[in-house]
Amino acid sequence: MGPAGATLEAFMINWMLSKLGWFEGNHLQDFTLHKNSGSGILTHGGSIANLTALSAARAAIAPEAWTKGSPKDLVVMGPSTAHYSIARAISIMGMGKNAFIPVPVDENEVLITSALESVYQEQLKKGKRVMAVVANACATSTGLFDNLDEVANFCEKHSLWYHVDGAHGAVALLSEKDKERVRGIERADSLIWDAHKMMRVSALCTAVLYKNYTSQVNTFQQKGSYVFHEGDVIGMDSMPFTVECTKSALGFKLYWSFALEGEKAISDFISNSFQQAKELYNYLSECSDFYCPYKPESNILCFQYQPEILTDEQQLDLRYQLIETGDFYITSCEVQGKRYLRTVLMNPLTQKKDFIALAEKIKTIATSIIKSAVK
């Protein structure tokens, strides 16, 4: 990556740590590992980031796992709606996907924190050790946030590693209007945070952040004379702490995004995107043919068109036909087994007239689908 790229990465990591209260340096160019300071690295996407963070959790509870393999009694608890990369990481680590223990969620797929204790006690009875507890900030499908403070209370009560998947929603830290959504995020032991989601950065660029720098140092225990050298090295070197050997100079594009627009502009973009989702919700809620199951907490909103008439397959067909028009692009997901249309608001030029046009286009396509079904 080179010395300049490594230094810029360390600078931006310090900036992100400072937003969590995990930075103990005198200024962002202070790269000294202070006793109570956090640490982190940038990596290529949330999947690798979750794998890295959970590897740190494993090193904390089972330091011998690096040489002897993952103990068979380790499990990870988290919402049943956790991103698929959590279960994938657990499998990659040799624990098997069944080592992910789902905690019940409510009708909007938000973690039921009151269920944590019973799930935990059940695992103890089975002779299991909980390696980590995962919380969503926010859920990929709905954009809704788990109660991070309540999960933190549970983890602190039982001295469990607390990991927050903040790939999409950790940016709420930068919005004065929305930072309440992530209250308690600073109590986590590890956090992943995508810059390529809502920080105006191209894919891929994800931070893995730790409250305590020793967590990062202990994650990977490996030697290789061609890249790792004994003793201190001159400058910054993130290689001992990442899955990747060679990686892009990720700190550059994150730095230049802020250098070009400034922190306030990025903050305003996030706040505006969250607000757009609320405005779309308000508009669709006034339309009798649309159903929105929840009020958005981020820039993601799920909705259905005439759910009492259109089947899940027809909702999906509606999306395909909408995309084929070339006028709009929306995604789709399942919430509690039901198919929804899903919007992610990220264009600062989006206005109410666009919401109206989207709704009208959906109505036109849906009418055609219904007529075809009758024939």
What are these regions (language model features)?
Residues 291-322:
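Conserved PLP-binding catalytic core of the aspartate aminotransferase-like
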Residues 139, 183-287:
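Active-site C-terminal subdomain of aminotransferase-like
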Residues 81-83, 107-108, 138-140, 169, ...:
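Short, glycine-/Ser/Thr-/acidic-enriched flexible segments
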Residues 5, 335-375:
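PLP-dependent enzyme catalytic core of the Aspartate aminotransferase-like
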Residues 1-46:
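Conserved N-terminal alpha-helix of the aminotransferase class I/II PLP-enzyme fold
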Residues 32-33, 48-217:
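Conserved PLP-enzyme active-site core in the AAT-like
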